[in-house]
A protein has these predicted regions:
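Strand-loop microenvironment adjacent to phosphate/nucleotide-handling motifs in alpha/beta enzyme folds
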Residues: 1-195
Length: 195
């Protein structure tokens, strides 16, 4: 949304799960273990990136000082963690034997939930910044007029309560986003990537 006509600078930061934050999986697993289980995992192969609260704060603050407007900053979080491995390790660290004393139950992916997180789309160009753990991606930028046209179309579809058209318009605006485990996967076939 960074528009040359505007004095407002928009900077985006992308990162994975923040350890210890509200909704984080670790406190959720701790409660389930304390209650005697089972520990619930949505899929045996699901993976997620993790970072600490100080790392997340540092990314946001550094991005604010580095950004000129329109950039997307991504924190290097290392390798993603398999959530099943995390559940097993937390059970062991709590003094229990996984699957014997505390069971792990696979409950299935929630609608729209992905097996892996995409921090950057494939077309994004990643550049190193002066901070060794922060990269900058320069995605395709739309002019404000194009964005306004999309917003008008999306608002009109929303007023008609046409969820499918809302999602279709959003996919036209952000064609790199592909649905997974969603009723809108069929719309991905019709979306053309802008060049």
């Amino acid at each position: 949304l960074q528009a040359k006509e505007s004095k407002t600078c928009f900077i985006t930061t992308r990162f994975g799960n923040v350890l210890g934050s509200n909704g984080s999986v670790i406190p959720h697993f701790k409660k389930q273990i304390a209650a005697g289980g089972p520990v619930t995992v949505t899929h045996q192969d699901i993976i997620r990136y993790f970072m600490t609260i100080p790392e997340a704060c540092q990314l946001v603050l550094q991005a604010g000082t580095m950004g000129q407007g329109g950039e997307v900053f991504v924190f290097d979080m290392g390798k993603p963690v398999r959530i099943m491995d995390l559940a097993e390790k937390m059970i062991k660290l709590s003094g229990f034997v996984p699957y014997e004393q505390i069971d792990i139950k696979v409950i299935g992916l929630r609608p729209g939930e992905k097996l892996f997180e995409e921090l950057l789309n494939d077309k994004a160009k990643t550049l190193q910044t002066h901070h060794k753990k922060i990269m900058r991606a320069k995605d395709q930028v739309l002019c404000m007029e194009e964005v306004n046209d999309f917003v008008i179309d999306i608002a009109a579809a929303a007023e008609q309560q046409n969820n499918t058209l809302v999602v279709k318009k959003l996919k036209e605006l952000i064609p790199e986003f592909l649905s997974q485990n969603s009723i809108y996967e069929e719309l991905d076939k019709d979306v053309k990537i802008r060049t």
